[in-house]
């Protein structure tokens, strides 16, 4: 079974840091924040095998560009599958205006 390198963009790392900070600092739940961060990180690392398992997004031009969406709890991980690598572009709260935030 083919394995892919998983690359996380600076923007996606920043998104994850903001998610952690919001839960830990604003909601005053540092243990919950760490758990959420770890679940997202583990899900991202799991993309090294069968990254095509998640659907392409429905909006254009993102769909044509090959952008896929993986749900992790209340968050969406957006990524593109290349020949040998998966590139994670963003990690966003699923209840937000995702199409607007992706552009």
Go through each PLM region and give its residues:
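Enriched for short, Lys/Arg-rich terminal
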Residues: 27, 68, 72-103
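Basic, Lys/Arg-enriched alpha-helical interface segments
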Residues: 1-63
């Amino acid at each position: 079974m083919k394995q892919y390198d998983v690359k996380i963009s600076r923007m996606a790392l920043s998104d994850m840091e903001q998610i952690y900070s919001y839960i830990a600092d604003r909601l005053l739940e540092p243990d919950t924040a760490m758990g959420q961060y770890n679940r997202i990180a583990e899900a991202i690392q799991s993309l090294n095998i069968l990254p095509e398992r998640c659907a392409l997004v429905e909006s254009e031009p993102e769909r044509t560009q090959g952008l896929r969406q993986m749900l992790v709890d209340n968050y969406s991980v957006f990524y593109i599958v290349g020949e040998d690598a998966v590139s994670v572009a963003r990690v966003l709260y699923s209840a937000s205006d995702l199409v607007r935030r992706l552009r």
